[in-house]
Amino acid sequence: MPQFNLMDARLKLERAREHILDVERAVENLTAPELYKISIQRDESPYLSVDFETLHDGNQYLSAIIGDAIGNLRSSLDYLMGGVVKPLGGNPAKVTFPFADNEKGFKGEVRAAPLLLTPDLVDVFDKIEAYEGGAGRNLWAINKLRNIDKHRLLITVNHLAGIKASWRAGSSTFTNCGMWVEAGKQGKAIRAPAADFEFTSYPTPMFQIMFDEPKVPPFTEVGPFLHLAASDIDSLLQSLEKV
């Protein structure tokens, strides 16, 4: 089996990882103290209340950065495919990474004439299962998200802002408890008898973004998903580099 030059695919993957770090830095900036109002007070009864308000506006910039990361992840797969078919006599400019919506369709794509895959390589790619419900479902989702991002910004409406704190209330202890609201909203985090209440760590801001696209499972957090997809691509590159 020929050796494959996958350096271009690796460069695209590294560029995608830089964009993923950009996403994480942008999210970290959204935990700036000036974007949160946290109040700790007693109400009319002998209770202590912790309320918070978030001052975030809608942020399409985040969706644009996420789209950049997804675009480079997707491109790295096409570059990978080009590196595989070139020594087999194929034309890298005329092939794309195989995807399908089910197992039958995926196996058909793997065996498509333009790829010129040898039987051994067919076995390798069959195991990738880049289809909905397959082992490579993250790669399948990246492909679907990339197709969406080519026409509009990805929807990450689920911007959640919150606070995290630890406290004792009577004989009960609560550690690193998070309370979330939709970004730009306000909410009540804690209400407890004041006489028996003590913070062990004071409230600190948090921020989280999740996909709101039908091709990604509900409540999928953006950062971890992108890292996982990048790791899947890296593992695939490693396996082909060892062939």
Model-identified regions with their sequence ranges:
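Acidic, Ser/Thr/Gly/Pro-rich intrinsically disordered interaction regions
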Residues: M1-V243
